[in-house]
From Swiss-Prot:
Pfam families: Ribosomal_S20p. This is Small ribosomal subunit protein bS20. InterPro entries: Ribosomal_bS20, Ribosomal_bS20_sf. Transmembrane segments: none annotated. Binds directly to 16S ribosomal RNA. One of its GO terms (molecular function) is structural constituent of ribosome. Belongs to the bacterial ribosomal protein bS20 family. Disulfide bonds: none annotated.
């Protein structure tokens, strides 16, 4: 445990940020799973809607620094390709 006051504050701040990041990453996984589930079921409309939601969440996570922008782009292109294959 740190002895310096500012470091004690940083420990608390870092823990809050870590928990927020874990929650956001969990939301991302859920959104991507929703896309995969819709694609597996062959539901084109639901897959397209889930793709829009997941893309928005990925962009927001990248802009907030939760994930890297290249990782967001890579994940978006992957789910978009799966949806596009479903749509034909």
């Amino acid at each position: 445990m740190a002895n310096i006051k500012s470091q004690k504050k940083r420990i608390l701040t870092n823990e809050k940020a870590r928990q927020r990041n874990v929650a956001v990453k969990s939301e991302l996984k859920t959104a991507i799973r929703a896309v995969d589930k819709a694609v597996a079921a062959g539901e084109a409309e639901a897959a397209a809607a889930a793709l829009r939601t997941a893309s928005r969440k990925l962009d927001k996570a990248a802009s907030k620094g939760v994930i890297h922008k290249n990782q967001a782009a890579n994940r978006k292109s992957g789910i978009a390709a799966r949806v596009k294959a479903l749509l034909g």
